[in-house]
Amino acid sequence: MIEVRLSPEAEADKERLPTQMKYRLDDVLERLESWPQVSGMKWLKHEWTGHARIRMGDWRVIFRIENDVLVVRIQHRSEVYEE
């Protein structure tokens, strides 16, 4: 099993999530622990090359894989790709 960590930005994003999304995030983080057998994952392109995302309704969990999984951002889909 792999370790899943949240960046400081992702920790702050998590605190701002609606309550129901926090429960769904827990499920997503559990799925990420079973890397590489993660369903619903998509590799990203352009400025997010090297990162992947999992959809959580209208929210996106952006992460990258190094020796473990680092969740970089957790944002609404209308905001996450603007950076």
Positions of PLM-derived features:
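Enriched for short, Lys/Arg-rich terminal
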Residues: 1-12, 16-23, 38, 56-59, ...
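A short, surface-exposed loop/turn module that caps and links secondary-structure elements
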Residues: 30-54
